[in-house]
């Protein structure tokens, strides 16, 4: 038995291959059969019917199923059970030099077995046959399962006629010397006997565990290890490779069991780094593209993309102390001249001239008038003291959109709708348009601000009340109102003065009828996280502060309406919370997060509204590259190289404007249309689009500002769009239907006309006409006659683009935009979907930005 075990271990590989080759010899139908030869396809049930003729298998103590097939005891089988003659084994030609003799130590078909069977008692024979039949049925069932589950990798093709079961008589007539145990025959056939014993044992007595172990031999185990490695590489974190004894690198691997010959070691996963950067992928690899056009502020590359590099205002770049982080030094450097004397008037006027924010004010003044106004305010002491200006926005609705959205959504989810549905004792109408910018929250804020503004303006005329007392009174009222409401918290920054929240003034960038626009700067703090709500140079944050004060003789109600409407519209667009209206309307589940709560990239952020005495301060996002008007007037690009137009309109503004490159103008046009479309989707039309109301960041991001004359054509409780009448805005950009007396028009189509004028201004350097009235403007009259007679306008025909196809598509869009009949005019949405805009490459990627309102 010791030699038997040793031979089994040493011939494991060969026994594996041989056992697979003769697997067909031990099919279920071959375990029991009749005396006559049965066909290979005989059903197991047919053999079971003749089980009384089945040979017996004489065994010793049978091993338990838990023992491995390699170490299970050898089974001795009667020749009439296997019906396997030596001539059939010889037909396999596994070893042609070997004789068909069996091993003397492990002979399974020995002559002594036949002799012992003849001398046994008949009763014992029947008892053994019954016992053996039960074992054969169990073995047959196991063999069927193993045959269905196991498919060998290598199979020898053996004809069915060569593996026929032999008759019992043939085995009985086997020669007596067939079991000779001479050393030569024993050594030659020892491996064959080991393979036969191993295969019989594995086929009859192995359980599910041993079957899996048998299946995981060398070839199958390697395959399973590779499969397991792929799964592990995806589900478990990879450990870094370790150095082996030879200095090489070894990754985590699964060793092959029983493989002591140095087989391949498969790693747990692919050999790559622990983390992969998106920039390393082919799609995101930064490939240096050749620049084919460089205009300083605008570059175009050979792959079709472009880059904006707009200049930052000198008030930021020329002020050395702005980057120093010292607010006192920065403030002093602006308010003192070169000789150290206080020369704030001249310095502010000089800085103001490089940036135009005249669009924020309806009264356009030249530089001398603005200087005189600034000087008069300083002499009269009418400058707003930012250190004493406090916010009049209720704390629970204040500034940060994240905090604002969180508190409102929390109140709605908790079912606290009673407070939202109250408006001075009156119920708010039912919400039918939840996407409208003016809804429940805005209505409440309008009422609260209007009351505070009127109260502040009237208290100025009351004797015994000064500005400081009024500001402190407002501060105390806001604090008491905040603390008195359940579920609200008093923010540390909500009641700080303007100078602490937004920094000190570093200069003036604009002036108008109601005051001036200053720039305030403060150092960044740990609470300032990306993305910033305004421009930052890395060390400081900059804010635009617009001072508003009613002129003598102005009606309080008129000033209050303008101030509140401008702030409310801008604040609601830049800090949208349309989920509140949607939840109240029942269109959004209280447990479902809002889907359309985000800031529009092309809308200027309105941050705060503050008060000091009878003056007010509106805090806005600061755009460091100025407005479109300043960009057009300081460019030095030839007209012929950009649009090819030989006939230019006479410049009617100060200075000579220079047009933009068509690709740059197309990018700005697409941003402008997206911003206007965002306003239209939320029920607001701008009604005063012009270069002065279009601001830029240094990277070319466009911002729409000045919502003082905007029209709310649909609120949250209005089902249909309502029109308006009367001309609004600046004359060169006003649509012709606005000049028709007592005629109503769609404010959205007015914005589309204005966008067309703005684009022509960008590519031509000036606007088309002074006013869209044929009796007052000869050029507009010429436009009407040419369109009526020829169907085209010579200025549009002479425009040139980088390609003839883009030029053709642009002309089609322009003709549809400048339809005098508003019913035939293209809409902003249709213009965005035109072939011209779809082929325009834009710097801003717009995703899920627009949500339509009800019509």
From Swiss-Prot:
The active site lies at 688 (proton acceptor)
Query: How would you classify this enzyme at the top EC level?
Result: transferase
Q: What is its EC number?
A: 2.7.11.1
Q: Which PROSITE patterns match?
A: PROTEIN_KINASE_DOM, PROTEIN_KINASE_ST
Name the residue ranges with Low complexity bias.
Answer: 57-74, 249-258
One Gene Ontology term of the biological-process aspect is: intracellular monoatomic cation homeostasis
Annotated residues that bind ATP are located at: 509-517, 546
Where along the chain is composition biased (Polar residues)?
Answer: 31-45, 94-114, 462-474
A Gene Ontology cellular-component term: plasma membrane
Keyword vocabulary terms for this entry: ATP-binding, Kinase, Nucleotide-binding, Phosphoprotein, Serine/threonine-protein kinase, Transferase
Q: Which catalytic reaction applies to this protein? A: L-seryl-[protein] + ATP = O-phospho-L-seryl-[protein] + ADP + H(+); L-threonyl-[protein] + ATP = O-phospho-L-threonyl-[protein] + ADP + H(+)
Residues recorded with modification Phosphoserine: 17, 19, 68, 72, 160, 273, 277, 324, 333, 336, 358, 391, 395
Q: Name one Pfam family in it.
A: Pkinase
Q: Can you provide one Gene Ontology molecular function annotated for this UniProt record? A: protein kinase activity
Protein name from the UniProt record: Serine/threonine-protein kinase HAL5
